[in-house]
Structures are given as structure tokens and as C-alpha cells.
Amino acid sequence: IHSCISGSAALPVDVQEKFEAVSGGRLVEGYGLTEASPVTHANFLWDVPRMKGSIGVPWPDTEVKVVSTETGEPVPIKEIGEIVIKGPQIMKGYWNRPEDTKEVLHDGWLYTGDLGYMDDQGYFYVVDRKKDMIIAGGYNIYPREIEEVLYEHPDVVEAIAAGIPDPYRGETVKAYIVLKEGSSVTEEEMNQFSRKYLAAYKVPRLYEFRQELPKTAVGKILRRMLVEEEKQKIKDDSQKHA
């Protein structure tokens, strides 16, 4: 194996490093959307310095900027905002869905719904989906940051973080984890591990170990399905006590 490109979902740095150690090849991350036919960014396949965790640089003839989610104005380098893209590969619109088209296309710019930033060398990073950002007790928390830490644990095979409804904090961070077969890691041990690398408000309040996580046909973990499960549990509990 010489080179591979990863897309569709965020590539944990730990997974990237393990893949390269086992295969001897180079694994780089790219980025794109169906609405962008579908690639807009990629890391270099040849041997040049790369930034781990980055989706790379824009493709030729592709314009990219990061804008404030509140004002729509461009934000400074390394500041998080929404990634918006313009180029020949951007769609003209959704077929027979004019209202949906208006939501994502403005003056030829595609508003991706992804939060990220650009560094001082022109490399871009995706932090998370705008809709997946967790707001707990007034803090903005990005699930991917938590997941990167969880994947560093030697017994973790898969992990995903989500914001579940909380009557006091708005949302609470919950981590869903698949452990290696035979692992005896406990919730408390995972909590202590997380506290070493995360600010206190980012540490998951809840952990759930599962045999597997719900996925799409191409293996992407379905965060929304897990959140819906939690909402259904709350609904069922409220009906029991009604």
C-alpha cells in the first residue's frame, strides 16, 4: 500500500497513526460534500510536511472562507466559524427544493454546516458539524475533541460523544464506547482518563459501553440515532410517572 485517502467522517489521529504503522502506507484525510461534486479539500499524497487532523488545502479553483455563525463575516486565522465554499464543483441547487437551496447557497457560496478554522499555512480543520455542537451550561463543546481523547485510550475500539437533553444544563455530554474484547475498563476509569486531557466542562458526565454502535451502510457512526434514543428514554420515563 502506497497511499490511501479517508473521507465521509472525521479521521481520528490515533486511527491514522495505527493504520500507517500496520500498512506502511500513507493515509491522508480529504473533505467534501455531495453538494460539491464531492471534493473540495485534500492533503498531499506525496511526501510533504502535513498537519495531523487537517482536511488539507482547497482544490484548484476552489475558494474557501470561514465565517462567523452570527454575523456571516470572515473570522481571523485559527478562529472557529462555518466553512463556506465557492467553485466550479458547487451544485446549482437541490432538484425541486428551492427553500432548501436558499438555506445553503448565498451568492454562489455553499454554506457547509461544518465548523472549522484555517491555520497560518492555509490548512483547514473541521471541528464538528454545527448541528452536533453541544451546549452544556452555556459552554460550547465540540464532540470531535472529546472523541480524539477517547480514541487515545488503549482499550477503546470506537467512540462517539453526543449532547443529550438535560433539564438544568440544556445538554449533558455522554460518551458511547465500544471496548476491545475482554476489556474490563469501568466508567470511573474512563472518567479519570478523560480528566487528564480535557477541561472539566468537556469531560463526559455519562458513559455507556456497547457491543456496537449504529452505523450507516458505509460505516459512519449515527450520532443522531443515539440522541434520538436518549430522547425516547426521557419520553418513556415521563409517561411512566405521569
Where are these regions (language model features)?
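Gly/Ser/Thr-rich phosphate-binding loop
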Residues: 1-50, 63, 70
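Active-site glycine-centered loops adjacent to acidic/histidine catalytic or metal-binding residues
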Residues: 8, 32, 56, 114, ...
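Beta-strand->loop->alpha-helix junctions that form or flank phosphate-binding loops
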Residues: 28-35, 55-58, 162, 208
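Short Gly/Pro-enriched turn/cap motifs at secondary-structure boundaries
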Residues: 52-59, 74, 104-108
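AMP-binding/adenylate-forming core of the ANL superfamily
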Residues: 65, 77-91, 109, 115-116
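AMP-binding/adenylate-forming catalytic core of the ANL superfamily
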Residues: 87, 92-93, 100-103, 115-202, ...
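Acidic/polar alpha-helix N-cap and adjacent early helical turns
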Residues: 228-242
